[in-house]
Structure formats: C-alpha cells, structure tokens
C-alpha cells in the first residue's frame, strides 16, 4: 500500500513539473530520473548490495576505516624532458606534501626506442622523461629514498625493462627488492583499445605480463604488477559504464592468462590494481567507482573462486579528466579539477593525481602544480569528505545509479565473453583503437 501511495504521488509530481523539466534538456550519459525515491531501489538488500566497509562486496570501500584510518596517496603525475628536470619536480612535490611519485615517460621510451634512434626524432622528451640507460634511471631518483616512497610508472610495452632498472637503482641504494612499493601500468590491452603504444602482437604481450606477475609474486611481493586502466578508455570517448566494462574485461583476460600459465588466483590477484578517470558529473562518477568495486568482487568470487579477500578488492588510482580541461580560460580548470577530486574521494580512491590548470596548454608550471596538489589537501583536511566512509551510501540516486552502471557494464562484459574475451575482441577489431583522421 505504501508503494502504491508513493507511486501515485510521484505521478502527480511529474505531471505538475513536466513543463518546467522540458526547459532543461537531458545531459549525456545514463538516463536520469528527475527525482529518486525508494521505488528506484526496490529489492535493495543492504548486506548483499552494500555490506560493511572493508567487507564483501566492497561497494562501500576496500578498507574498514577508509580515510579515517589513512588518507589516499597524493600521487602527482610528472615527467619532463630530462631525468634531471624530472628529479627536481619529484623532489619539489615530496617537499610540498606529495606522498607518492608517478612517472611520465616520453613516447620513444614508451615504445622501446632510445633517444638516438631516428624513429624518436621530434618526440624525445615531449610528453615525459626520456630514459635510455640505467644511469638515466639513477639520475631520475637521485636523493629519493626508494625504500620510503612508493612509485607508479606509467609504462606498458617495455614495462619489464623499466621495472628491472628500478630494482637495480634500489639495489644500488641498498633497498632490497622485497621492500619496494609501487606500481607499473603494464596494461597492454588498453593500448590496443585506446592509445596505440604497443610493440608486439597481443598474445606475445600477454606472455610478458604474466611473466611479470610471476616474478613479482616471488621477488617483489609489495609491488602492484599491473594498473588495469580505464582512464585512457574514457579519454578515448567511452561512457562511464563502458570505462569499467572494457577495463574489467581486460582484467578478466589477464587473470585467465595467468591461470593458464600455472599460477593460482590468490597468488597474484591481490596485486592487481586499477586506474580510473574522474569526470565532471560528480554523482555519476561516485556511482561508477562503487559499481566497479562490487562488480570486480563478484567476478573474483563467483567466476574465479578466489578465497583470499584481498583478491576480491578492487584498489584503484584516479586521475582527473584531461579531456575536460580547456585551453581557454584555464583558471576555470581549477574548479573542474576540484569537482573531480571530490568525486574520486567520495568514490573511495586509494590514490589520486589532480591535473593542473594549464595542462591543456603545456607541461604545468610550478605554481599550477602546487595549486593542483593543494586542491587535494584542502579536500582532505577542510571539506569533511574524509570524515565518513562512503558518505553517499544509501542515497536513492547514488544507489540506483550504482545499480544501473553495474548492469550496463555486465552487459558489455557478456558481449565480450561471447566473442571469446578481450583478446579476441581486440583481434576481431571490436575493441580496437584507430587513429583519428587528420
């Protein structure tokens, strides 16, 4: 009876407001209701759909206390033309409160060319640091204790080479490999789907990735062996649901490759991590982050029969959306980044890079990157968003959007499974990056 009464009131409300609503067009993305009520989450079961923070299905977060126990890592992505310049920026960020490093490499490094190769002409040091030798890597981390800082390296096709260099530099510093903390992106499938910086065909590339899984599980156990990346997929034009669907489909492919190579699910799954994009639609993004955790946990438990809770936890890094920055009126980008930061924090990110206001124009100035870092610090210490775990949990709108994004993502994953998985979807051209026409 209560539901019937609510339905009647809602119908009357919508009829009364129809003319006003018609003046405001729908925004892109999933279809939104004008107002949300308990009717939008009928069948909702708290323990099944949400649970306690830090417990399966991890909708509310992968840690029981989330930011009340420890804030997210403030990991600013940076890379200048030379190792010396990049080292200077890394040290500046650490001195100003950055709690992790994130290395950007130039395109020749990303696709395995030395700077003196003719194929590298015109691209050396343009979008990141050029690393050709072990000496370059030593300079990059000069006066930075690799035993005390965690480092993320955005490197894919030659990930094994850059990781080997990093381990060698740490050994020279006296830091054993089993004490190193950090992440290599190492996500080659999204290169075929969204970026195009690959070296080898898909299947040989998958072998390199599973070799890294196995090596690190035995020798660098604190290292995150992959950052399965939806960020680039979103930047290439996907929706929120497609971002998590295509990325989780890639994650399934990596797991299947590792299992086929003889590894056991709980020996490596706990070190798989993800990388999401934060766009401007704050509440939709929060719902996306929550849906991704629940979907991954369900897949690991029901499809791959993981036993260790760590294997089911989707831990993720977030970067604010580069595609949302404008070259015109760049100071407005500060506000955009602040909104995206709030979305990432309310969505439960483990680490965060905030873009600088001028990145649509050039590498960020020192002043701009300081503002970007301070944005995180203000949200962390002054907004109150870090005081409550999953502050939007229970919202009719957020729970309904979480369900809708998860359902749409599941449908895409089903389609990819029918093709034989992400590798086959790429080989068939269904999930494949094509360069935009000039």
How would you name each of these model-derived features?
Residues 433-438:
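Conserved small/polar residues in nucleotide/adenosyl-binding loops
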Residues 2-279, 284-285, 303-306, 310-317, ...:
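Catalytic alpha/beta active-site cores
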Residues 1-8, 106-109, 390-399, 403, ...:
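Often metal-dependent polyanion-binding catalytic scaffolds in large enzymes
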Residues 217, 259, 277, 291-305, ...:
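Hydrophobic alpha-helix feature that most strongly marks membrane-spanning transmembrane helices
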Residues 122-126, 192-199, 235-237, 276-281, ...:
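Short beta-alpha connecting loops at secondary-structure transitions
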Residues 133, 375, 394:
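Residue-level signature of catalytic and energy-coupling elements of molecular machines
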Residues 203-212, 330-333, 408-427:
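Phosphate/diphosphate-binding loops
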Residues 248-251, 284-372:
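Glycine-rich anion/phosphate-binding loop at the beta-strand->alpha-helix junction
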């Amino acid at each position: 009876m209560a539901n019937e009464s609510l339905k009647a009131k809602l119908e009357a409300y919508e009829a009364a407001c129809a003319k006003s609503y018609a003046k405001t067009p729908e925004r892109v993305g999933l279809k939104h209701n004008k107002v949300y009520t308990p009717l939008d989450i009928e069948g909702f079961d708290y323990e099944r759909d949400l649970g306690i923070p830090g417990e399966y299905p991890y909708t509310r977060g992968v840690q029981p206390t989330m930011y009340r126990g420890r804030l997210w890592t403030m990991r600013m992505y940076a890379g200048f033309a030379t190792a010396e310049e990049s080292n200077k920026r890394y040290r500046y960020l650490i001195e100003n409160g950055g709690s992790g490093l994130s290395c950007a490499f130039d395109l020749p490094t990303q696709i395995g060319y030395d700077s003196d190769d003719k194929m590298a002409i015109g691209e050396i040091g343009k979008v990141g640091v050029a690393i050709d030798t072990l000496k370059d890597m030593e300079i990059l981390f000069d006066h930075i204790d690799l035993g005390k800082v965690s480092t993320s390296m955005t490197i894919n096709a030659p990930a094994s080479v850059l990781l080997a260099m990093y381990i060698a530099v740490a050994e020279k510093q006296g830091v054993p490999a089993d004490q190193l903390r950090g992440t290599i992106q190492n996500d080659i499938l999204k290169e075929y789907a969204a970026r195009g910086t690959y070296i080898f065909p898909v299947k040989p590339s998958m072998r390199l990735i599973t070799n890294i899984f196995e090596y690190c599980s035995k020798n660098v156990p604190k290292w995150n062996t992959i950052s399965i990346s939806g960020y680039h997929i979103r930047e290439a034009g996907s929706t929120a649901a497609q971002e998590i669907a295509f990325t989780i489909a890639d994650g399934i492919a990596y797991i299947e490759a590792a299992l086929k190579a003889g590894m056991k699910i709980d020996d490596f799954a706990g070190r798989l991590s993800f990388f999401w994009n934060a766009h401007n639609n704050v509440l939709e993004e929060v719902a996306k982050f929550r849906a991704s955790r629940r979907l991954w946990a369900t897949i690991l438990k029901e499809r791959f029969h993981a036993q260790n809770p760590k294997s089911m936890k989707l831990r993720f890094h977030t970067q604010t959306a580069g595609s949302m920055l404008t070259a015109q009126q760049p100071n407005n980008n500060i506000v955009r980044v602040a909104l995206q930061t709030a979305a990432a924090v309310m969505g439960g990110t483990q680490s965060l890079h905030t873009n600088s206001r001028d990145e649509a124009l050039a590498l960020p100035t020192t002043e701009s990157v300081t503002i970007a870092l301070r944005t995180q610090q203000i949200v962390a210490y002054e907004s109150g968003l870090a005081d409550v775990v999953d502050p939007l949990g229970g919202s009719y709108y957020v729970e309904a959007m979480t369900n809708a994004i998860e359902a749409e993502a599941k449908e895409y994953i089903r389609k990819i499974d029918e093709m034989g998985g992400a590798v086959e979807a790429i080989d068939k051209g269904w999930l494949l990056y094509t360069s935009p026409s000039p």
